[in-house]
């Protein structure tokens, strides 16, 4: 499900969700200047990709990592007090599969989740109190 400030594609163009509402049994979203039922055609998630990661400050490390027999490229984002490691595989059933590991303040505190889409990455960042990163992605 989508959340406020998530980025999605609407008719092939990236749009940010600026409001969500429920009326009766239908969910509506507002994408910048467009308001409509979420079930309408045209809204699609954005797949996590290597170009997206590079555009948003992740650095590709020349290291191939294996999880559950799948090969993943390693991307790293470093900032004050935390390290984000994102491992992204080649296509698996039509989708890139990403595995996100966030270490905060050099402690054992971390989140380890599997993701496919940009809005899922945004929501994982928000859960780790990295709202400013989640809400400022470049598409």
Question: Which residues does each predicted region cover?
Answer:
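Short beta-strand-centered aromatic/proline hotspots
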Residues: 6, 13-26
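Residue-level detector of beta-strand structural context in well-folded domains
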Residues: 6, 51, 56, 73-75
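Acidic, low-complexity, intrinsically disordered interaction modules
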Residues: 24-34, 38, 62-118
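Intrinsically disordered, low-complexity, charged/polar segments
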Residues: 34-62, 112-128
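Short amphipathic alpha-helical segments with coiled-coil-like heptad repeat character
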Residues: 58-64, 136-139
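Charged phosphate-binding loop/patch that engages nucleotide di/tri-phosphates or the phosphate backbone
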Residues: 125, 129-139
């Amino acid at each position: 499900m989508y959340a406020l400030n998530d980025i999605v594609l609407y008719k092939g163009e990236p749009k940010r969700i600026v409001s969500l509402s429920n009326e009766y049994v239908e969910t509506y979203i507002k994408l910048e200047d467009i308001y409509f039922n979420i079930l309408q055609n045209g809204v699609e998630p954005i797949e996590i990709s290597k170009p997206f990661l590079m555009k948003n400050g992740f650095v590709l490390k020349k290291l191939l990592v294996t999880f559950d027999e799948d090969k993943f490229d390693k991307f790293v984002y470093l900032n004050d007090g935390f390290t984000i490691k994102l491992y992204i595989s080649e296509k698996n059933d039509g989708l890139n599969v990403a595995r996100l590991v966030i270490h905060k303040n050099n402690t054992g505190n971390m989140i380890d989740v599997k993701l496919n889409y940009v809005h899922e990455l945004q929501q994982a960042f928000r859960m780790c109190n990295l709202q400013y990163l989640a809400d400022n992605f470049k598409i």
